[in-house]
């Protein structure tokens, strides 16, 4: 059985993440704020979809819905970092949905990515399918 949830976007890409990490004199404060905001928003999406907590090992399938071809697919996929972090158990000072304990090798069985452009009235974002392994 798999579980699916939607994260409205567009999510920040690799270039935005690097720019935020280099901001504020390279101290990473802007990246930390970006990560905290997006992780918290994604946790809400996970909880709203009622993805079960306490899974041992999962694989994630990402279906990225982009508004245009402005960003390369590999740039867009960088946002998976925020999604994996949101799936983890909450830690001191960090939001987490508790679907898995951590996003390390023992819990992360990998991921698959597909990309498509917005179709009609659809909004940009990402569909995430969590598959227990």
Task: State each model region's role.
Residues 1-133:
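Catalytic phosphate/metal-binding cores of nucleic-acid and nucleotide-processing enzymes, i.e., regions
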């Amino acid at each position: 059985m798999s579980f699916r949830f939607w994260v409205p976007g567009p999510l920040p890409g690799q270039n935005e993440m690097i720019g935020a990490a280099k901001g504020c004199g390279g101290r990473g404060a802007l990246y930390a704020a970006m990560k905290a905001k997006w992780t918290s928003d994604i946790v809400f999406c996970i909880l709203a979809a009622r993805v079960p907590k306490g899974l041992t090992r999962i694989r994630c399938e990402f279906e990225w819905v982009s508004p245009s071809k402005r960003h390369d697919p590999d740039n867009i996929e960088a946002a998976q970092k925020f999604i994996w972090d949101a799936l983890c158990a909450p830690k001191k000072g960090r939001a987490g949905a508790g679907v898995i304990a951590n996003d390390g090798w023992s819990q992360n069985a990998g991921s698959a990515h597909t990309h498509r452009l917005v179709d009609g009235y659809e909004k940009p974002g990402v569909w995430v399918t969590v598959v227990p392994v």
